[in-house]
């Protein structure tokens, strides 16, 4: 796939530099140093290519989950009946064992990256919906009333008041979506992905503790970097909007 080829074609020094600069922008010196060291570990471990495939699969799945989940979350936040229906739906999704998601997608699409993405999207969809709905519902009613009195239309109210104020909460939902996507990618190694999850699975079948530990740490470090950057950006938005 073109996106996958693009990720694999980027030289690792460029990727490390860009992500470190992003970390510095949101979290300043400490976060940038932490990010640089964690990325260097992945490079030194020799698993950079598999890490980039993991980032590609996780990133693509999270984007799809957010495209589906955030609008549904907005709808749930504005409509009580939709909120009840979607809450029941995502509660059901979250109670299913992770292996269950693989059964229907393998039957329909066989094995491969696309199958893995569908399973990951289904597994990671819940936080995108839940946190967005929570962010929309928790906006101060006085701000809504003031906006309506000022003459805001419903469209302006949504895009200029509700969404900006709910954005820190939405970012935390994206953060949780990334965490769930990464955890599911280890399971989707069973359907033929060639990422860090496959490395963990191979290590498990061969009882190779060292190999499994290094691959597991690489997955954990990707999660830590994403978590720290998103939380830092969310905190900055809270300060900006006085939340």
List each language-model region with its residue ranges.
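Membrane-spanning helices that line or support transport/gating and their immediate boundary helices
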Residues: 50-54, 74, 84-88, 131, ...
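Alpha-helical membrane-interface segments at transmembrane helix boundaries
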Residues: 1-8, 48-56, 60, 83-86, ...
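Transmembrane alpha-helices
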Residues: 118, 122, 154-188, 210, ...
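Glycine-rich helix-loop "coupling/hinge" segments at transmembrane-helix boundaries
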Residues: 107, 136, 181-222, 238-243
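Transmembrane-helix boundary motif in ABC transporter permease subunits
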Residues: 21-24, 39-49, 61-90
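Short cytoplasmic-facing helical segments at TM-TM junctions of multi-pass membrane proteins
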Residues: 128-173, 200
């Amino acid at each position: 796939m073109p996106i996958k080829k693009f990720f694999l074609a980027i030289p690792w020094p460029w990727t490390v530099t860009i992500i470190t600069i992003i970390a510095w922008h949101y979290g300043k010196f400490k976060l940038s140093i932490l990010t640089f060291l964690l990325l260097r570990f992945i490079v030194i471990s020799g698993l950079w290519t598999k890490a980039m495939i993991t980032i590609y699969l996780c990133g693509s799945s999270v984007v799809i989950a957010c495209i589906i989940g955030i609008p549904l979350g907005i709808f749930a936040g504005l409509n009580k009946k939709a909120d009840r229906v979607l809450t029941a739906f995502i509660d059901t999704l979250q109670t299913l064992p992770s292996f269950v998601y693989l059964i229907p997608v393998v039957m329909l699409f066989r094995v491969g990256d696309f199958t893995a993405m569908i399973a990951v999207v289904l597994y990671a969809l819940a936080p995108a919906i839940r946190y967005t709905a929570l962010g929309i519902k928790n906006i101060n009613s006085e701000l809504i009333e003031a906006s309506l009195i000022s003459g805001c239309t419903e469209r302006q109210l949504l895009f200029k008041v509700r969404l900006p104020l709910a954005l820190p909460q939405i970012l935390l939902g994206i953060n949780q979506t990334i965490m769930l996507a990464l955890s599911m990618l280890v399971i989707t190694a069973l359907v033929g992905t060639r990422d860090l999850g496959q490395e963990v699975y191979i290590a498990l079948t061969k009882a190779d503790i060292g190999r499994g530990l290094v691959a597991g740490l690489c997955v954990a470090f990707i999660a830590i970097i994403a978590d720290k950057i998103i939380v830092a950006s969310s905190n900055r938005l809270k300060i900006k909007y006085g939340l």
